[in-house]
Amino acid sequence: MRLQFIPIHVFRETPSVTFFDAGVSGTNGTDVVVHRGAATSPPDVNGFEQYYVHQHQVDHNLVLEGQRTFVLLNPAWDQSHHVIHLIREMGALQIPVGTYHRSTSGETGSMVLNQS
């Protein structure tokens, strides 16, 4: 399995301001996930890491502000464990169906646009 990043399209830049299209073709749901300060999603339960896994949707996570570290686990991949330090310039991280995933932010937090 090869990880994919969907590129963003910067259509205008002025001093201190960037305008870009954050859309991902073929998606039908969008949510904004804000981490205020150091946060983990989903949070640990009784000291044990928790993970999301979707059986019927592909997530596309685009950092809007800050940075987010994603842990991806998928036993079907040749390399089943990946840690991605995601920033906006990388584009939207595609998380395939059946992939266990979680994310953390540093002390300053982050904002991510998730399109599925």
Residue ranges and their predicted role:
Residues 1-88, 107-116:
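Active-site region of the double-stranded beta-helix
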Residues 90-103:
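Histidine-centered metal-chelating micro-motifs
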